[in-house]
Amino acid sequence: MEPTIDPPLVVASLVFFGILVASFVLWIQHIRRPKNIVREMTTENCVPAWNIGWVNFGIFICAVVTAVFAVQSIASSIFLQPPSESSDPITLTPSLAIFAVLFLQLPMLAVFYAARRFYPGHYASGLNGVDLTHSNALRKAVPLFLMFLPLIWITSIIWANVLSVFQAAGWVEEIEQQELVSLLQAGGHPVAMLLLVALAIVMAPIVEEIIFRGCIYRFLKSQTSLMAAQIISGCVFSIMHANLLSFVPLILVGILLARIYEKTGNLRVSIWFHALFNAFSLLMLFITSMSDAIPH
């Protein structure tokens, strides 16, 4: 019996191989650059610290949490019927996921802009130390994304194996993917799925970069060292995603996003990197979902 060719497996393999080659070439170019150019590229302190003190920062975070909780509570009371003891648990659907994302992201964005609008003395400091257009930011983000993506893959593989050891030892229970990832793999109404993908690629990177890098990282930078601020903000970023399987890889992603923000001096580069990462992850989910050879 002749072996059958699995087209999605071939496409996925070519994509991975292409990214590995591109990453290798970019790292070689980076290493071979003249020292003065490398030193100029790695100069830090491009991002203005957010020195507002713990009290004002605490007020801001409390406002964000309160707004999210209030909006989600109101939305739940309007769109969801309270479950009875005999009813089945609420199943996450694409439409429900869209509302969940919107009612999480929009309140955070609203608090951020309201604070800057009504209390500019504390909350309206500049996010960027370097001016970049969207196209220039994208040109900076693409090579950085290609350079660091294999590092994220390696971290994911190592962490998955560590979790397998923990699971075999009985230290952790069944390891599940993020609910949104499972939902995207399962599929649904095309319009709802497209909206969900758009939120993941467009809205989530913008809001999360503003909050986690533009606010949390810049504040931590004013209180501690750059490396500590990058690590702590990366940990907070990962914890907020509430998934054990992606916990350590997302810490690395959060650290990389903070370092990219710091070294380029413009939040748009981090937003583009984040958008590329989410888009690539969704693309690979789509490809693997069509494969009979790749485990889902």
Regions found by a protein language model. Give the residues of each.
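N-terminal, membrane-interfacial amphipathic/helix-forming hydrophobic leader that caps
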Residues: 1-140, 282-296
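Transmembrane helix-loop-helix hairpins at the membrane interface
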Residues: 2-6, 13-27, 147-159, 171-296
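Helix-to-loop transition at the C-terminal end of transmembrane segments
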Residues: 30-35, 79-80, 155-169
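Short helix-terminus and kink motifs of transmembrane alpha helices
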Residues: 68-77, 121, 156-160, 164, ...
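Membrane interface segments of multi-pass transport proteins and intramembrane proteases
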Residues: 80-89, 129-132, 166-172, 219-227
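Internal hydrophobic scaffold segments of catalytic domains
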Residues: 132-165
